[in-house]
Amino acid sequence: CIRDRYYKRIAFFNKYSLIFHFILACFITFTVEVISRRDFFSAVSFVGNHTWAYLYNAFIVFASLSIVYLFKTRAQLRVLITGLWIFLGTVNGIILSNRVTPFSYTDFKMLPDLFAMQNTNYFTAEEATVVVAVVASFIIFLVLFFIKGPKYQGKRHVVLSPLAIVALLVVGIPITTQAAQSSNIIASYFANIAQGYSDYGFVYGFSTSVVGRGMDKPDDYSKETIDAIETLVDSSKEETTVSAGKEPNIICILLESFIDPYDVNFLQMSEDPIPTFHSLEQNFTTGYLTVPVVGAGTANTEFEVLTGMSMQYFGTGEYPYKTILKQSDCPSVESIASDLSSIGYGTHVVHNNTATFYSRNNAFSKMGFDTFTSKELMNITEYTPSGSWPTDKVLVNETVKAMDATENQSDFVYTITVGSHGDY
């Protein structure tokens, strides 16, 4: 009868569940890549050109599926785990349709900023509603499936199964990861996070952002070690002095998405589109700057420039503004602003976007800036053609106002643009 065939099929799947888990893991991994890359053939190319990386990604998914052996509701948990991976891949695909940097664990810390940016080029209120509706529907389905769905009736190994799963998660994955990294199948650090996800797969890239929280604590780290380093530095340091009344004002501008059009070889121009920049380039010091991000993550370029600390010290996709600088045991961090303040400079930030975006209001106070003039404090009347971002014209007057506010001081002003923000 139908009931007997149903139970025989269930018994067959349970008997060979490890094999089916491997097949399911490969399917999930491929599906996630198709969604993330938004192209079926790109996913096929990834499997063909990075086969071992693809199989390693599938191994991570396989390990996550092994958790089902601890419970009777195995079918339900398989659906849940499958749904979670595909949901993460879908989020990544949506994000990559609006920016270059893929989805990472640190983006969860950006959720308050994201919800504050509805009806922008990033996403609309309608898109947010659809996402919430789909997630809610899936949760309702899961609840009903957990209540009404089948339960495992076979014998459970209450000791062997947990030990095997713990060994797989705690020993198997680290050893396999180390072997894959040593064989150059995957990389331990992504100089370019977008390229890393593309070459090594979303599952590994996202997992790295979860467990990779930056540099480990050095074995010899102690108060005595730090005191010895401080003594060594103090023995050779020199004091910075500037003649009174001759301190130069310093203006640092982060100009989003700016390039020299002449660097694009296939473009032909009837006249110089950026004559002022080229005049400065010809008459003063100039050069190229290597930055840790492309297409998103502006705050990490800021962090490197202002503090001198490399993003290689931090985890994959991490934003120090949203992590270390928000910890209570980090009252301050040395920066250009704090160093200039110590020799009498006034230090200011001017930015025509929301103060809380990337938690800049907190970060800049930790870096020692005296003032932060954000969008909320400006009289903004002009916006870009898309209507999403204020034009940067307002920053000229606001930068001058910041310097004029300290008549008897020289100033360091860090001005951040937003008009050229986002996709074109």
For the regions a language model picked out, list residue spans one by one.
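Transmembrane and membrane-interface helices of multi-pass
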Residues: 2-197
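Residues that form generic nucleotide/phosphate-binding pockets
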Residues: 34, 117, 209, 232, ...
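Secondary-structure junction/capping motif
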Residues: 39, 104, 184-206, 260, ...
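Short alpha-helical interface patches
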Residues: 99, 107-119, 205-214, 223-236, ...
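Alpha-helix initiation and N-capping motif
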Residues: 108-111, 199-203, 226, 274, ...
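Membrane-interface segments at or immediately adjacent to transmembrane helices
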Residues: 174-252
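Solvent-exposed soluble domains appended to multi-pass membrane proteins
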Residues: 236-248, 252-255, 260-424
